[in-house]
Amino acid sequence: MVTVSTVTPQTSDKALFQRRDAHLTLETDLEGSELFEVSLGELTPTRPTDEAADLTVGTAGTSIAGMLCEGRFALYLAGEPYKSGLKAQGCGKLKKAVFSIELDEDEEAE
């Protein structure tokens, strides 16, 4: 599934990490740029997991940070806490495409 949206970036301290356990997430900016953060540590949930959306949000320590812009993409692995849509200096709204790629449960069992 792909979702295209216009996003107003927020500062890192206002954003929570998110984690999807049954999906890979691939993001690319169509217009504008943003910062992102990834945690290699444990996610501490701030509310119950939304099983239907395969989404857990919470806090974690930042291990890696980077910048996403037109022509580049970021791939977040299943189970990997990340923040995206973070404000980059001098950048306003951005248009982005988010691809949600469902994992094959049978493949994981093997």
Regions found by a protein language model. Give the residues of each.
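Conserved short histidine dyad/triad with adjacent acidic residue
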Residues: V2-A22, D29-P45, A78
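Short beta-strand-initiation
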Residues: S12, D21-H23, G61, C69, ...
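A generic local secondary-structure boundary/capping motif
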Residues: L16, K87-Q89
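Short, conserved beta-strand element in jelly-roll/cupin
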Residues: D21-L35, L40-E42, T49-G58, M67, ...
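A short hydrophobic beta-strand segment most commonly corresponding to one strand
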Residues: L26, F73-Y76, C91-E108
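Short, surface-exposed beta-strand-loop junctions and turns on beta-sheet-rich folds
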Residues: E42-T44, Y82, C91
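Conserved metal-binding segment of the jelly-roll/cupin
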Residues: T59, M67-L86
